[in-house]
């Protein structure tokens, strides 16, 4: 039940690192008990892993976790992360630029998530969606099928009466349902030869993801319904 909030998320994180962003989301939104449970559950699962397979666990945490290149094909259009975007722009060392973008993205998502959470109601759903987008953006590898958050934004936006959220839903529908990231030749580093406008469409998820965070972080009041309040 309620006592498992945070623990379940961090247990999932130990099996797959992508949900780990939500442990930070608990902190940003002031859900401190859930954050503590997430931290405790995470440390417990790591300890169990070391007890069961010490050598494999050590290799994973000290080597494999920090070497995404082991997955191969990181310039592939299917890698819809900020790192993938940079690799397709300049096929070389982009670590410093990536770290700066990751920091900015985390701040942006944190501001948006906190403001939306404090708004209560449907805004708390959008707060969670901001965390999901941030996780996909900052991960070194985010395959296109990780971007289920786009589908959730479509559903949430169409169910929301506010114009900003509805526009975001339409933009995400255009980006995802048209499969525009696959419109051009992909694989075997063919993405590197694409023109600038082809790269923009190929990196649709990252660009729309950042734009969504900006729109929601500016001020949640600006995403209110376009209907004016009655004059007195």
Regions found by a protein language model. Give the residues of each.
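Transmembrane helices and adjacent periplasmic/lumenal helix-loop junctions
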Residues: 11-26, 138-146
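Active-site catalytic microenvironments for nucleophilic, acid-base chemistry
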Residues: 26, 155-156, 160
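Single conserved hydrophobic/aromatic residue that forms the stacking wall/gate
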Residues: 1-6, 11
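Short hydrophobic/aromatic segments of transmembrane alpha-helices and their interfaces
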Residues: 7, 17, 126-127
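Aromatic-enriched
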Residues: 158-232
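Internal amphipathic alpha-helical segments of the cytochrome P450 catalytic fold
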Residues: 1, 20-21, 33
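Primarily membrane-embedded glycan-assembly and transfer machineries that use lipid-linked glycans
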Residues: 29-147, 151, 155, 192-198, ...
């Amino acid at each position: 039940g309620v006592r498992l909030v945070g623990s379940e998320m961090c247990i999932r994180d130990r099996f797959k690192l992508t949900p780990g962003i939500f442990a930070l989301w608990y902190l940003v939104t002031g859900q401190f008990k859930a954050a503590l449970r997430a931290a405790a559950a995470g440390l417990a699962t790591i300890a169990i892993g070391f007890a069961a397979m010490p050598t494999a666990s050590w290799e994973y945490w000290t080597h494999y976790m920090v070497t995404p290149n082991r997955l191969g094909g990181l310039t592939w259009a299917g890698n819809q992360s900020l790192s993938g975007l940079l690799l397709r722009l300049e096929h070389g060392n982009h670590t410093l630029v990536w770290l700066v973008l990751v920091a900015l993205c985390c701040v942006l998502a944190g501001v948006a998530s906190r403001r939306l959470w404090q708004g209560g109601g449907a805004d708390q759903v959008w707060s969670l969606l901001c965390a999901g987008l941030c996780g996909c953006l900052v991960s070194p590898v985010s395959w296109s099928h990780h971007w289920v958050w786009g589908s959730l934004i479509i559903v949430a936006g169409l169910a929301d009466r506010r114009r900003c959220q509805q526009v975001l839903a339409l933009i995400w529908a255009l980006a995802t349902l048209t499969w525009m990231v696959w419109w051009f030749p992909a694989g075997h580093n063919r993405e590197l030869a694409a023109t600038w406008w082809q790269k923009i469409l190929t990196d649709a998820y990252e660009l729309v993801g950042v734009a969504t965070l900006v729109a929601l972080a500016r001020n949640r009041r600006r995403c209110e319904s376009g209907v004016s309040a009655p004059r007195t």
